[in-house]
Curated annotation (Swiss-Prot):
It is an enzyme of class 5 (isomerase). This is Mitochondrial mRNA pseudouridine synthase RPUSD3. The keyword Mitochondrion applies. It comes from Homo sapiens (Human). It holds the Pfam family PseudoU_synth_2. The keyword Transit peptide applies. One of its GO terms (molecular function) is pseudouridine synthase activity. InterPro entries: PsdUridine_synth_cat_dom_sf, PsdUridine_synth_RsuA/RluA, RluA_PseudoU_synthase.
Amino acid sequence: MRAVLAREMDGRRVLGRFWSGWRRGLGVRPVPEDAGFGTEARHQRQPRGSCQRSGPLGDQPFAGLLPKNLSREELVDALRAAVVDRKGPLVTLNKPQGLPVTGKPGELTLFSVLPELSQSLGLREQELQVVRASGKESSGLVLLSSCPQTASRLQKYFTHARRAQRPTATYCAVTDGIPAASEGKIQAALKLEHIDGVNLTVPVKAPSRKDILEGVKKTLSHFRVVATGSGCALVQLQPLTVFSSQLQVHMVLQLCPVLGDHMYSARVGTVLGQRFLLPAENNKPQRQVLDEALLRRLHLTPSQAAQLPLHLHLHRLLLPGTRARDTPVELLAPLPPYFSRTLQCLGLRLQ
């Protein structure tokens, strides 16, 4: 298995290449042949500002987030700096948390600045298009292509892999709570429901054929607990279906909402230390509430915790090789600084 890995060294990214053999030097390392779901991932080097060095955050924002009120030019510059690999028509980004891929006309999104990004990267003949991307609230890999034929081939590959239940995407998540099982499958029927002006993903028990025809979808994810500590867990998640907020809702169904989930975490209630699910339809989105012990461990005040970004990161993608029998190509995106800081505070490691 060949890999692409970008790491930050003294503020500068070191870029790897794929499909063209190993590029020796910093940031590019071979990964084990057993690079499936149980692969031992490499622990990201802790950035400056980790818990052991700096303690409380003070009034500083969480490191690794996009500044608010960016101009189009500033967003293009930020995305260009987020490029972790270029090969042929493919461009891979490590998307910051909070940046939407698409949106309403006039909104600043990844899609809206693709023409400028294409020009900035010197792609004049063909404009970049999105092949695969993490959602707005999650961070991580975005795969772009300037070749429509390549984009179509990759999209067919991802579709066939899902039908065969072969995971191609691996997310890292930190959860508030520890799943009862160390690994397994999460299956749930989900639907989108408009509640108080917001589109929310809602579980559906025992969906009927009519429900399926009306948009209810059966969803499936694999999960594996990598490490636990301080009542939290580092979990690897592999979605085998595609649905809005699927991974967040799946972890809520495990009574372990993702840290920084201010959309669905209120569906988990606690009485006398025991967690239980509350009716999704009756629970509006609200800021996630963390207990005092966890706040102390994270060196956060309640007001800071209310701004905690979602700790859900598209860490790895598998792509087909150049020939049918080639081993898959692995793309890796390093964790955001705020994510690494949380792992440090909780004593969690990607083993």
